[in-house]
C-alpha cells in the first residue's frame, strides 16, 4: 500500500484549552498540525502555504470577522471549522466563511478530529477538486468517488465543476470596490488581475495546469472589487495585442489567438454567475 500523504491542519486559536486539544489530536490521526494565537503569524503562514492546507480551524474572537474578510479578499477558500463559546448564547447564524463550514462549540471539542474529515468532505462535495490539495481526496474514504472527477478544459465541464463553489460568496464590502480605491490601489489591483489572467491564458489548454484555481482567484478578486465585465474584456484585449505583436515578430500566424476567446468566455461566465448569486433571493 502506498504511503498516505500528510494532511496539514492550520489553526488560529486564542484559548489554551483549544490549543491543548489540537495538540492531543496531533498525536492521533492528523499527520501535520500548525496553529497560531497571533493573527499576523496566521496570515503570514497562509500566504506562504495556502496551497498545502487541508483544513482551517478558527476560534471565534473579536478579530475573526476581519480574518474572514482577509480570506475572502485573498481568494483563500478552504475547508473550515469555526469554534464558538458553548455558553451562554448559541453561535450566531452563518454562514460566516462559506456555506460548507462546520460549526462547533467549545463543549464539543471531543468531536474535532471527526469534524475535520466532515469539513473536508463537505467542502469537496460542494466543489470537487477546488481549493483542496489533491492528496486530501485520496486520504479520506468518503471522498473516493469525488476523486475521480476529471478536470476538463471545455467550458461546459468547468462550469459544472465550479457552480457550487461560486455560491460561497454571498456578501461584499463596498468599501473595497474598485471605484472607491485610491489611484495607487487601483493600479495594484489591475496589475494583479493582468498577471493572473496572463497565467490563465498560458495554462488554459495545459491539462496538467491548475487553471481552475487561477480562474477562481481572478474571478474572486474581480467580484469583491466590483470589477466590470468591460474591464475584464479590456485586460483580455491588451494581452492579446501583446501576444499578437510577439507572434508577428516571430513570423507566426495570429490565428491561434482566436482559441483564447473561450478563455474570455469562461472567465466572464463565472464572474457573471457570481454577480447573479450575490443578488438577494427575494429581489
UniProtKB/Swiss-Prot annotation:
Keywords, alphabetical: Biological rhythms
A GO molecular function held by the record: identical protein binding
Effect of residue 270 to A: Induces a decrease in activity and ability to enhance KaiC phosphorylation
Ranges of residues in domain KaiA C-terminal: 173-281
GO biological process: circadian rhythm
InterPro entries (alphabetical): CheY-like_superfamily, Circadian_clock_KaiA, Circadian_clock_KaiA_N, Circadian_clock_protein_KaiA_C, KaiA/RbsU_helical_domain_sf
Domain notes: The KaiA C-terminal domain mediates homodimerization and formation of a stable complex with KaiB and KaiC. The N-terminal pseudoreceiver domain (PsR, residues 1-146 in these experiments) is not necessary for most KaiA functions, while the linker region (residues 147-179) between the 2 domains is probably required at least for KaiA:KaiB interaction. Undergoes large conformational changes in the KaiABC complex which inactivates the second KaiA monomer, preventing it from activating the KaiC CII domain. The PsR domain binds oxidized quinones.
Subunit structure: Homodimer. The KaiABC complex composition changes during the circadian cycle to control KaiC phosphorylation. Complexes KaiC(6), KaiA(2-4):KaiC(6), KaiB(6):KaiC(6) and KaiC(6):KaiB(6):KaiA(12) are among the most important forms, many form cooperatively. Binds to KaiB and KaiC, the N-terminus (pseudoreceiver domain PsR) is not required for either interaction. 1 KaiB binds to one subunit of the KaiA homodimer. KaiA and CikA bind to the same region of the KaiB(fs) form and therefore compete.
Protein name (Swiss-Prot/TrEMBL): Circadian clock oscillator protein KaiA
Lineage, top ranks: Bacteria, Bacillati, Cyanobacteriota, Cyanophyceae, Acaryochloridales
The gene coding this protein: kaiA
Amino acid at each position: 500500500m502506498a504511503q498516505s500523504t500528510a494532511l496539514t491542519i492550520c489553526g488560529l486559536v486564542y484559548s489554551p484549552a483549544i490549543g491543548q486539544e489540537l495538540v492531543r489530536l496531533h498525536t492521533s490521526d492528523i499527520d501535520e498540525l500548525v496553529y497560531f494565537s497571533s493573527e499576523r503569524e496566521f496570515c503570514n503562514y497562509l500566504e506562504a502555504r495556502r496551497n498545502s492546507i487541508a483544513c482551517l480551524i478558527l476560534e471565534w474572537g473579536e478579530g475573526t470577522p476581519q480574518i474572514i474578510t482577509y480570506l475572502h479578499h485573498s481568494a483563500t477558500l478552504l475547508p473550515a471549522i469555526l469554534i464558538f463559546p458553548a455558553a451562554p448564547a448559541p453561535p450566531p447564524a452563518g454562514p460566516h466563511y462559506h456555506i460548507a463550514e462546520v460549526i462547533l462549540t467549545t463543549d464539543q471539542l471531543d468531536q474535532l478530529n471527526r469534524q475535520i474529515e466532515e469539513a473536508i468532505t463537505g467542502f469537496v462535495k460542494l466543489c470537487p477538486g477546488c481549493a483542496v490539495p489533491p492528496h486530501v481526496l485520496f486520504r479520506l474514504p468518503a471522498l473516493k468517488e469525488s476523486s475521480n472527477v476529471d478536470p476538463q478544459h471545455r467550458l461546459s465541464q468547468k462550469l459544472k465543476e465550479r457552480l457550487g463553489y461560486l455560491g460561497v460568496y454571498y456578501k461584499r464590502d463596498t468599501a473595497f470596490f474598485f471605484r472607491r480605491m485610491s489611484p495607487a490601489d487601483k493600479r495594484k489591483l489591475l496589475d494583479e488581475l493582468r498577471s493572473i489572467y496572463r497565467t490563465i491564458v498560458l495554462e488554459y489548454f495545459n491539462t496538467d495546469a491548475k487553471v481552475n484555481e487561477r480562474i477562481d482567484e481572478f474571478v474572486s478578486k474581480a467580484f469583491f472589487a466590483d470589477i466590470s465585465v468591460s474591464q475584464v474584456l479590456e485586460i483580455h484585449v491588451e494581452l492579446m495585442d501583446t501576444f499578437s505583436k510577439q507572434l508577428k515578430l516571430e513570423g507566426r500566424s495570429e490565428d491561434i489567438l482566436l482559441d483564447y476567446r473561450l478563455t474570455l468566455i469562461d472567465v466572464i461566465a463565472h464572474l457573471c454567475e457570481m454577480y447573479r448569486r450575490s443578488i438577494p433571493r427575494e429581489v
